[in-house]
Amino acid sequence: MGVTKKPDLNDPVLRAKLAKGMGHNYYGEPAWPNDLLYIFPVVILGTIACNVGLAVLEPSMIGEPPDPFATPLEILPEWYFFPVFQILRTVPNKLLGVLLMVSVPAGLLTVPFLENVNKFQNPFRRPVATTVFLIGTAVALWLGIGATLPIDKSLTLGLF
C-alpha cells in the first residue's frame, strides 16, 4: 500500500475545487434515483420472498398448545425479563429485589456520564465504559440463563 500525502489546503487549485463543492462529498453515484428506485425494492421484495418461502416450506408452530387444566410448576416470564425475574427470585427480601431492579436502568443511565470527557469512539480507548458494558452483559447473561434453571441450581448455573 502506497503512502499518500495529505492535501495541501493552501493550494489554490484545490481551494477552487473545494469551493465549487468538489470535495470529499462529490464522488460516487447519487442515492436518488439509483438506490431508492432500483436497489431498495429488490432487497425488500427479496426479503419478503424469503420470509414467505420459509413460511410455506417450513411452517413451525409457535409452541405446544396450552392446556388450561394443567399449569406448569413454575411460570416463566418472557425471555427479556429473565434477568430481573432471577433477581426477584433469588433475593430473599422483596424490597431489596425491587431496589435492585430499579438500579438496573439507573445504572444504565449513568454509563454515558462515566467518560463524558473522553471523546473517542473506539471502545479500546474508553476502558471504563467498555468494562462496565462487558461486566453488565456478563451479569445479564448469567442472570438470564439462571432464570431458566431450578432455583437450587440458578446461581451456579448447575456447574458446581
Curated annotation (Swiss-Prot):
Its main location: plastid. It comes from the Eukaryota. Keywords: Chloroplast, Electron transport, Membrane, Photosynthesis, Plastid, Thylakoid, Transmembrane, Transmembrane helix, Transport. One of its GO terms (biological process) is photosynthetic electron transport chain. It is a multi-pass membrane protein. The chain crosses the membrane at residues 36-56, 95-115, 131-151. It is found in: Plastid, Chloroplast thylakoid membrane. GO terms for cellular component: chloroplast thylakoid membrane. The keyword Manganese does not apply. The keyword Transmembrane applies. InterPro entries: Cyt_b/b6_C, Cyt_b/b6_C_sf, Cyt_b6/f_cplx_suIV, Cytochrome_b_C_euk/bac. GO terms for molecular function: electron transporter, transferring electrons within cytochrome b6/f complex of photosystem II activity; electron transporter, transferring electrons within the cyclic electron transport pathway of photosynthesis activity; oxidoreductase activity. Component of the cytochrome b6-f complex, which mediates electron transfer between photosystem II (PSII) and photosystem I (PSI), cyclic electron flow around PSI, and state transitions. The 4 large subunits of the cytochrome b6-f complex are cytochrome b6, subunit IV (17 kDa polypeptide, petD), cytochrome f and the Rieske protein, while the 4 small subunits are petG, petL, petM and petN. The complex functions as a dimer. Belongs to the cytochrome b family. PetD subfamily. This is Cytochrome b6-f complex subunit 4. It comes from Solanum tuberosum (Potato). The gene is petD.
